[in-house]
């Protein structure tokens, strides 16, 4: 995997930086593990825009990912590493000894032909999935469940990972990339190592059209709008916000806490905000 800076043969390619991985599989995805993905363009069931800046983009098929890693005690060979348009990480196609195939998030350092396993008895090596109670304290992990059996929810993006800090009784403490320290049950599963494609954050899009291919529409600044459209709008000539920065609906935009889930507040040992 390498970063390639393109030659400025056009205005759009000037400054563009791509992530090139010659080891990625160049064929079609495994048909049995793909599903139709309908583009919603940011609209809800009544056709109204509920998420701005979405629409258009290339048609995509969804790859069904095994986030539970619950096929225990059966060795699986990494058949190939593939690109997935639905996420920043690459995915790996596993072929189990009984013939079943499943996609997983491709961990860093895992190569084609390597043997992986899941379950409490799996060895401690990158790509293997185990309950947190069986993982040594201090290990770097990813694809972590928040509830046993629910499937991985934490650290799934390219280059991300979590550190296992401690185990106390039925719960373990994890340090997330944001700095937050969170408790999860020791029966929750996690995968050893960190997510691959770590250079994803270093790419440079280069031109607006590349974002349109991804289904991302333009973002207009509030200060460039009229007062009827945004709280920052209006004024003669170029102006600032003239107030605390807010969203189009008046919610403070920078640093304002929006978490409202009291039910799981006791699972957060230390907030990512130090204040």
UniProtKB/Swiss-Prot annotation:
GO CC term (a single one): large ribosomal subunit
Pfam families: Ribosomal_L2, Ribosomal_L2_C
Record-level GO BP terms: cytoplasmic translation
Chain positions covered by the region annotation Disordered: 24-54, 223-275
UniProt biased composition (Basic and acidic residues): 25-38, 229-241
PROSITE patterns for the chain: RIBOSOMAL_L2
UniProt keyword terms in alphabetical order: Ribonucleoprotein, Ribosomal protein, RNA-binding, rRNA-binding
A GO MF term: transferase activity
PANTHER family on file: LARGE RIBOSOMAL SUBUNIT PROTEIN UL2M, RIBOSOMAL PROTEIN L2
Quaternary structure and interacting proteins, as annotated: Part of the 50S ribosomal subunit. Forms a bridge to the 30S subunit in the 70S ribosome.
Function per UniProt: One of the primary rRNA binding proteins. Required for association of the 30S and 50S subunits to form the 70S ribosome, for tRNA binding and peptide bond formation. It has been suggested to have peptidyltransferase activity; this is somewhat controversial. Makes several contacts with the 16S rRNA in the 70S ribosome.
Family: Belongs to the universal ribosomal protein uL2 family.
Listed name of the protein: Large ribosomal subunit protein uL2
Lineage: Bacteria, Pseudomonadati, Pseudomonadota, Betaproteobacteria, Rhodocyclales
């Amino acid at each position: 995997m390498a970063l390639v800076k393109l030659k400025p043969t056009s205005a759009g390619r000037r400054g563009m930086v791509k992530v090139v991985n010659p080891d990625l599989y160049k064929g079609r995805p495994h048909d049995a593990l793909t599903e139709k993905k309908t583009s919603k363009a940011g609209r809800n069931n009544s056709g109204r825009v509920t998420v701005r800046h979405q629409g258009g983009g290339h048609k995509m098929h969804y790859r069904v990912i095994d986030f539970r890693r619950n096929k225990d005690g059966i060795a699986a060979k990494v058949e190939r590493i593939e690109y997935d348009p639905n996420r920043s990480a690459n995915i790996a196609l596993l072929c189990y000894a009984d013939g079943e195939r499943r996609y997983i998030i491709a961990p860093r350092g895992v190569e084609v032909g390597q043997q992986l396993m899941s379950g409490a008895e799996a060895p401690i090596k990158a790509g293997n999935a185990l309950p947190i109670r069986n993982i040594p304290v201090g290990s770097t992990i990813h694809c972590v469940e928040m509830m046993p059996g629910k499937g991985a929810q934490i650290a799934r993006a390219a280059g991300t990972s979590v550190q296992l800090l401690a185990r106390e009784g039925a719960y373990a403490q994890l340090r997330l990339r944001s700095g937050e320290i969170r408790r999860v049950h020791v029966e929750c599963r996690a995968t050893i190592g960190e997510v691959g494609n770590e250079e994803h954050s270093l790419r440079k899009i280069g031109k607006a059209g590349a974002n349109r291919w991804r289904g991302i529409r333009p973002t207009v600044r509030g200060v460039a709008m009229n007062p009827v459209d945004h709280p920052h709008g209006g004024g003669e000539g170029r102006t600032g916000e003239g107030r605390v920065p807010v969203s189009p609906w008046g919610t403070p935009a920078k640093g304002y806490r929006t978490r409202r889930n009291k039910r799981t507040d006791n699972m957060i040992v230390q907030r990512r905000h130090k204040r």
